[in-house]
Amino acid sequence: MVKSYWKKFWGSNVTKSQHFIELNDIAYGNAKKIRVGIDAYRENVIVYRCVNLIAQSAGHVPWKVLKSKSGEVIANHPLNNLLKRPNPEKAGADFFSELISSMLLFGNSYILSTSDFRPKEIYLLPASATEAVLDQNVLVAYKYQSASGDKLYRIDPISKISRVLHLKNYHPTNHHYGLSSLEAASLPIDLHQQSSYWNHSLLQNGARPSGALIVKDSNGYLSDEQFERLQAQLSEKFTGSNNAGKPLLLEGGLGWQEMSINPKDMDFIQSKNSAAREIALAFGVPPQLLGINGDNTYSNMQEARLALWEETLIPLLDKIADNISNWFSYLFNEEITIDFDSDSISALTEKRENLWAKIANANFMTLNEKRAFVGLPKIKDGDSL
């Protein structure tokens, strides 16, 4: 009865073949904002590295399904296979890496269930083609835009659950969309990009600053014919990397005056490194891991990697785990908890071994208390000191 209600509310199921068509046939909306995110990822090496480092590191952490009350691992739950292979197109690691990348670049990620209950496949909807549908400022559905037509996924007004799970970053002024890390880092990204463009342009001009030709005679003017001839000669023979180093021969009454600041005077390298550090800060990545000069906050790379996991990746994985646990509990109609396997994270090995050593030496805990602390089941006669 409950199942029929959900089917009636959400409408007819979308077949598997339709998902393959729609997810590869996107009609992009909000083009300007999307273009900024895509261009920053494609063209800025710091943004590209930050996104890939976070997404690939966190995306490859395995997941496990547990009973919510007891915390016992459910080894044969169908969600285990679903999280390892969400759909025929993507493995679990690629799926979650793409999900995290979308949250970083756009502030939003959308997971689509192919059925109302106990789904066997889940897909990612492109954030660039998915939008919230509001009715009197109340979220009522999600709309996926494709070239073959729009698809509407309604939200149950009672449970607030939909076949689309929306994961978003916190946004101080918008309750329906998340804030992208790119927006917070827009100024340093622009500074870093312009520094790269300026340096590239300077190299194309033979690493010589811009300047002007000045007429020094008493008249101070050139005829139109003289001006056009001089301009053509300069463009043809003295601009571009192929003409770098050629001597500039000036006629009588002409002089060259530099008009730009050279790279040393404008502290070019320092300003670019400073912008790179601010970009890394916005993404929560220690600059040391990106090879940025002048930043030695941590004494070694191991400490920097540990800081990345504890301050950025683990909170991000916790957020994803909380959201998908609540969503799948409704879709599977059972109280389950989905958590990531922290024991598989190599960066936490030393810290985990130190914790185990302290627990093993604790004489005020029973054996079963120690086992429960590290997630192991109880054993017989393990409740006495």
Curated annotation (Swiss-Prot):
InterPro entries registered for this protein in UniProt: Phage/GTA_portal, Portal_HK97
UniProt cross-references to Pfam families, sorted A to Z: Phage_portal
Domain of life from the UniProt record: Bacteria
Family membership: Belongs to the phage portal family. HK97 subfamily.
Name listed for the protein in its UniProt record: Uncharacterized protein RBE_0759
